[in-house]
Amino acid sequence: LVLGPKLYLEDRIRLYSLIWDEVEEFTQLLRTLLNALSSLGYAENAYCPLSALIPRETSIIDVNTLEGVNDPKSAPLDIVTPKGIRTSLPRSVIAALVAELTIVMEEKPAKYFDYTDLLDFPGYRSRYKFDDVRKELKKTGMLKEMFLRGKVAYLFQRYSAENELTSMLLCIGPSNQEVQDLPGVINSWIAVTH
């Protein structure tokens, strides 16, 4: 994978597609996301208007916005990089790319916010264990579900590995949860951070 960044875009996509046995839906998703990053000059940060968050139904932080990630007709949103590169990308693509969102508050409700970041990992679920991924991807919404599970797991692992999570509040609703591997994930976090 060291070779990947040195390759032209399509060659890089072909190389990475070997990881998932060249499943076309995953390859197309990677192509969509890499093209979006390319249009931003591969910037690590970008700015977007408040309309990126409201209304809630189309917010880039609402996991349901990922539904149209491979749909080029998804509602566009204008964004700009710190270097002034401006582009318009589908909200679903921005939702897929965003790892962290910084919201500046005019008035802080408590001093706690001077030294605390709040991270939310929505939709944390157990990973799927499929015998035939291609068959499962034919089901409506399955690409979004697989991407969401992978993204949330990746972000949690990344923040844990970089010791950016120092405290945790675990909220679980009263219904049956589909997170059989959650105890192991929490134990790993405790072992790494404490």
Question: Each predicted region: which residue ranges?
Answer:
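Globular "head" domains of long coiled-coil molecular machines
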Residues: 1-194
